[in-house]
C-alpha cells in the first residue's frame, strides 16, 4: 500500500532542533532507527517533468465561497539543479531575483495608491511552480475588479511587461537594495532570538530541495558584496529571463454567483 511503498528510511529524515547534546541525540536516533532495513524492491521516486507550452494554458474554477476573482499568471522555467545550489552564484542569482520582485511589487503598490486602483490587489512572486520539483515560475497574483476585469488584467500585465522590456532604474535598484540590506541586518541582529520553527523550516528546505543553509553573518556579508558588485544591467538582464511571454499558465478562481460574468478561456488568454 501507499504507506509501505513510500514511508521508508531512504526517503525520510529525522530533524531535531533545540537545546540538545548532539552526540547523545545522534546516538539515540541511530539506536531507534538504525536497524530498519532498506526495502529490497523499493519504488523509484521520480520527479516527473512539466512540459513546456507555446500556447498559454488557461484553467478556471468557480467557488461559492470565493469572494473575488483571483488570477494567477505563471511563467515557468527550469529549476536550478540541486547540485548547483551550493555554489555562491545561486545565492547571487536569488539575490537579484528578490530585487526584481521587490521593484515590481513597489510599482504595483504605487498603482494601488490611486483613488480608484485598477485592481483590488496585486503582487509578484518567484518560486516553485505549484507542486512541481522540475519547474519554478515567476507569478503575478492579482484580484480583479468585478466591474472591469479586463482593466485589472491590463494594468498588471502592462506593468510586468514594462519591466521586462525596459527594465528598472538606478534609483529603483538602490531602494530595493536598501530594503534587502535592512532585512539582512535585522536577521543578523535577531540571530540569537530565533524560535525552533525557523531552524526546522531551514532544515526541511535543505532536505527536500537542497536549499543551502547559511548563517545570518554569512548572508549579510554576501549581501554587502552583492550590493557593491551587482549592476543594473545584470538585474535588467535577469528580469528579461524571469518575466517571460512563453511557458505561461493562467489559473483563475472566481465567485460562483449568477451576477458574476466570468470571461471565457479564450477571452482571458487575449487579456494577457
Q: Where on the chain are the PLM-derived regions?
A:
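A common structural junction motif
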Residues: 32-40, 158-168
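Acidic/histidine-rich, surface-exposed loop or edge segments in extracytoplasmic proteins
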Residues: 135-137, 214-220
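Non-catalytic beta-strand/loop surface segments
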Residues: 1-11, 35-81, 90, 94-150, ...
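Extracytoplasmic/secreted cell-surface and envelope-processing proteins
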Residues: 22-26, 82, 260-262
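Segments forming glycine/polar-rich beta-alpha architectures that bind adenosine-containing cofactors
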Residues: 230-231, 238, 242-272
Amino acid at each position: 500500500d501507499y504507506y509501505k511503498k513510500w514511508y521508508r528510511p531512504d526517503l525520510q529524515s529525522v530533524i531535531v532542533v533545540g537545546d540538545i547534546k548532539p552526540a547523545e541525540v545522534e546516538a539515540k536516533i541511530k539506536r531507534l532507527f538504525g536497524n530498519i532495513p532498506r526495502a529490497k524492491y523499493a519504488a523509484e521516486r521520480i520527479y516527473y517533468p512539466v512540459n513546456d507550452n507555446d500556447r498559454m494554458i488557461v484553467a478556471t474554477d468557480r467557488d461559492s465561497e470565493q469572494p473575488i476573482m483571483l488570477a494567477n499568471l505563471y511563467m515557468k522555467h527550469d529549476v536550478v539543479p540541486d547540485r548547483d545550489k551550493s555554489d555562491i552564484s545561486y545565492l547571487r542569482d536569488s539575490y537579484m531575483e528578490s530585487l526584481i520582485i521587490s521593484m515590481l511589487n513597489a510599482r504595483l503598490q504605487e498603482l494601488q495608491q490611486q483613488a480608484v486602483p485598477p485592481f483590488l490587489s496585486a503582487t509578484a512572486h518567484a518560486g516553485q511552480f505549484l507542486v512541481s520539483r522540475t519547474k519554478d515560475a515567476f507569478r503575478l497574483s492579482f484580484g480583479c475588479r468585478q466591474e472591469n476585469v479586463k482593466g485589472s488584467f491590463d494594468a498588471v500585465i502592462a506593468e510586468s511587461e514594462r519591466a521586462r522590456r525596459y527594465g528598472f532604474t538606478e534609483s529603483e535598484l538602490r531602494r530595493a537594495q536598501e530594503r534587502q540590506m535592512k532585512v539582512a541586518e535585522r536577521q543578523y541582529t535577531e540571530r540569537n532570538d530565533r524560535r525552533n520553527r525557523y531552524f526546522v523550516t531551514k532544515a526541511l528546505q535543505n532536505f527536500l530541495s537542497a536549499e543551502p543553509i547559511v548563517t545570518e553573518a554569512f548572508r549579510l556579508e554576501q549581501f554587502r558584496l552583492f550590493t557593491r558588485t551587482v549592476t543594473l544591467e545584470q538585474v535588467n538582464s535577469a528580469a528579461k529571463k524571469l518575466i517571460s511571454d512563453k511557458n505561461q499558465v493562467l489559473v483563475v478562481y472566481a465567485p460562483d454567483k449568477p451576477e458574476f460574468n466570468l470571461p471565457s478561456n479564450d477571452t482571458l488568454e487575449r487579456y494577457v
